[in-house]
Every structure is written in C-alpha cells, then in structure tokens.
Amino acid sequence: MVLNFLSPSLSRLGLWASVVILMVIVLKLFSLLLRRQKLARAMDSFPGPPTHWLFGHALEIQKLGSLDKVVSWAQQFPHAHPLWFGQFVGFLNIYEPDYAKAVYSRGDPKAADVYDFFLQWIGKGLLVLDGPKWFQHRKLLTPGFHYDVLKPYVAIFAESTRMMLDKWEKKASENKSFDIFCDVGHMALDTLMKCTFGKGDSGLGHRDNSYYLAVSDLTLLMQQRIDSFQYHNDFIYWLTPHGRRFLRACKIAHDHTDEVIRQRKAALQDEKERKKIQQRRHLDFLDILLGVRDESGIKLSDAELRAEVDTFMFEGHDTTTSGISWFLYCMALYPEHQQLCREEVRGILGDQDSFQWDDLAKMTYLTMCMKECFRLYPPVPQVYRQLNKPVTFVDGRSLPAGSLISLHIYALHRNSTVWPDPEVFDPLRFSPENAAGRHPFAFMPFSAGPRNCIGQQFAMNEMKVVTALCLLRFEFSLDPSKMPIKVPQLILRSKNGIHLYLKPLASRSGK
C-alpha cells in the first residue's frame, strides 16, 4: 500500500533528476561551445595545421616524433599557429623570439587548464601563484638562492654523485650498456632531499623509500592526467584507480613534508637544537623558508611552507635528471666534445680532491656544451600561460585577454631563422662573441622574463658538478641498438631510456 503510494512520487523525482542532469549537461556543452567559438575567433588570424574533427591536434601530438612534427609546423607557419587539444582547449603555439618576448616579458599567470592539475600535490606555490601573492613569495624565496647559500651545496652535489658513480663502476664492469636515466633520477632526488630537508638516503636506496616512490608516482600520474581527456574532469578522475593512486601518493608526500616541518619548528624552539642548526656547514632550503619574513614581519604559513617545499621538490628533481641525462647522451654522441670537456675539467681540478665554488665559473667549454645540449634537448620542452590582458605581436596580429599561450621551447630552439643549421651540435654558438648579439628570448631553457626559473643557478651548479665528475670517472659511448626516442612529457624523456656504454678511466680524480 505504502509502496503504491510512493511509486508516483519516486517516478516524478527520478524524472526531475533526469531533467536537471540533462539541463546541466546542455548548459555545460553550451558553455564549451561558446568557449570554442571565442578561442577560434581570437586565433582566426593565425593559420595552422588541419585539425581532427573531435581530437584537434591531440592525436598528432601524442604520436612518437611529435616534437619534430611541431618543428615542421613551425617552418610551415612562421611565428605561431593554433594548437587544439580536443575541440574546446586551444592554445596559440609560439616559437619565435619576438613573440616569446611579447608574452614572457610580462607577468601573465600560468595556464589554469594545465597547471591546475598540479594543485592537489604542490598547492599554491611559486609555480602556480600569480599577482601580488606570487610577487610576495618570489621576494621571500629569492634569498634562498643567493650564492652564499648555494656555495656549500657543491659538496652535497659531489657526495651524491660519487655514490652514483660507485654504482656505475659495478655496472660498467659487465661490459653492457645500461639506462642512466633512472640512476640519475635517484641521485638528483637524493641531492634535493639533502638540500631541502638536510637529509637524504646514503645508499640511494629510494626504491624502499615511500617518499621517493610517492614523488616519482605523482610526476608520472600528473603527466598521464594531462594526456588523457577523460581525466580532465575532477569528479571522474578521483573515481578512477589512477585518481585514487594519485591521492594516496599525495598523502604520503604531504605527510612527509608536514612531519619534517613540524620537527624542524620544534627543534628551533629548543635552544640547543637551534644552535646545532645554526652551526651546520650549510642551511637547507627549509631552514631558509622558516626564517624569511615580509616587510610586515609576516612569515609563511604551514600550508605555504609545504607548497613551496613540494614545488621545489617537483621542479628541481625531474628537470635536473633530464638535463644531466641528455647532456651525457650528447657527450657520447660527440666524443670530440666529450674529450675537450674532460681535459678542461682535469685542468681545473689539478691536484685538488674535489671541486670548489670558484671552479664552477672556470668550466667555460663544459658550460657551452651544456647550453648547446639544452638548446637541442630542453629539459622542459613546452610551457603555458594565460593572458591577463591583450597582447599585440610585432607583426600586428593580436590576442585578447584570457587567451592561452603555449611556448614550444623545443621548436624555438630549432628555429632555423634564429639558429643556423639548428640540428648541428655546435657549442661555439654560446661563446661570448657569438652570444653577445643574440635575441634575449631566443634561448629559454629556464624560461625568461620576470617569471623565469628562480632555481636556475642552483640547477646549473648541480649539473656542472655532476657532469664534471662523470667525465672524470668514465668515457661515455653510444649503444647504436638502443638509441633514445624523445618523448615530450612534463620533462623531455626517452621512451626507451638513455642507454650508454661506460668505460672506467684510470684516474683518481672525481673519486
């Protein structure tokens, strides 16, 4: 009886729910169509490659060889062209210095369509902040990258590198090529943990380290989410196994960072512990963050501390891994430059047992080779912005506020109008006389303008120490049967790893 009475009500309720859901879907679709129309109208003056009716350029971008496909598009469509991920997300893809300057000399925010996926892990740190809050954090963090702070890190870079090289001695004795990318990643994270938290893993045994596994997992899962349209919706993503795995990894990473912050704050309250911290041979990144204040005397909150630490770990780990790995690949590919770098490093080290801060500035040829490697294999091949005001480019074409910009660094660095013979490895491009007249936005491995990479000096110093010690211990050569296949993810990776042969050198230097 009761069921019979309720049945019409339940039916009506189900009908209304269906109508509401349908209306929401229609409104969402209408909103997306309006956005599509607005974006298409904004980019109407920019011709580009043909698009798929549903996926836009996404299918082309996800294929192997997509980086060189974009370079070919850049030759066909000078300055810039539209780039569509599906039918509702469209960027103006730029790869010309004057176009890059028009956008990157300003302080426009990062594109939310891409970088909002990072928020669950790294929070609102320097990478994703904009406006006055970004300026405040940038100012507070800048002292953490002063050369007086960076000087003691040279010994930390060397310590972690030598542990990796000892591991490579054993692998090299097998007379087989092996993938260096994973080991370089372990070393880079060990270094970063020492510089950030004041502690690392003395044996590089990160496979059993939950924090290391979480950071590695989060990086790969974020890339997977960006590449998969069905994962762009938060509600859908958190219901999937990958979404739940992402949340678990986030919790592990956050719990670790929160606990380290809590312990460090407690130590600073204890006078004896505070003196120990002050007497250490170096201050780590967390020490500096805990001490900074703005003009009003306000410190970073715990949430802000965690966001900046997590941002530093995210930005400083994979990018350095990519840069070092591709540099060693270039050294194997061009043995004549490898030998010149090695001779320079030997001359600088002399009778010393290890490198000093002042030695880094003397590595001129190694630095030129490193920059040429960054040109051909930029660690971050593509970055994104969202215009907060209109922009007019040098050729008179313009975009309105709200438009999305993709700076394709890989294509910019292979732009033949800027770089003659762009596929040729020529370190002398970066000699003082050749670099003097170059456009300031022609070479952007660390971005450029007011929102450039705050940690670029830290990264350059680390890569110099690591690569110099590598060249002192080993001669690197290619495995022709396992040449790397470039894959553009959050960083530039190789689909099949970077496999090299290593031949130990009879020298005590670098040990």
From Swiss-Prot:
Keywords: Endoplasmic reticulum, Heme, Iron, Membrane, Metal-binding, Microsome, Monooxygenase, Oxidoreductase. SUPFAM superfamilies: Cytochrome P450. Heme binds at E315, C453. GO terms for biological process: biphenyl metabolic process. The keyword tRNA processing does not apply. This is Cytochrome P450 4B1. It catalyses: an organic molecule + reduced [NADPH--hemoprotein reductase] + O2 = an alcohol + oxidized [NADPH--hemoprotein reductase] + H2O + H(+). Its main location: endoplasmic reticulum. Its EC number is 1.14.14.1. Cytochromes P450 are a group of heme-thiolate monooxygenases. In liver microsomes, this enzyme is involved in an NADPH-dependent electron transport pathway. It oxidizes a variety of structurally unrelated compounds, including steroids, fatty acids, and xenobiotics. It is an enzyme of class 1 (oxidoreductase). Belongs to the cytochrome P450 family. GO terms for molecular function: heme binding; heterocyclic compound binding; iron ion binding; monooxygenase activity; oxidoreductase activity, acting on paired donors, with incorporation or reduction of molecular oxygen, reduced flavin or flavoprotein as one donor, and incorporation of one atom of oxygen. It is found in: Endoplasmic reticulum membrane; Microsome membrane. InterPro entries: Cyt_P450 (IPR001128), Cyt_P450_CS (IPR017972), Cyt_P450_E_grp-I (IPR002401), Cyt_P450_sf (IPR036396), Cytochrome_P450_Monoox (IPR050196). Induction: P450 can be induced to high levels in liver and other tissues by various foreign compounds, including drugs, pesticides, and carcinogens. It comes from Rattus norvegicus (Rat). Its cofactor is heme.
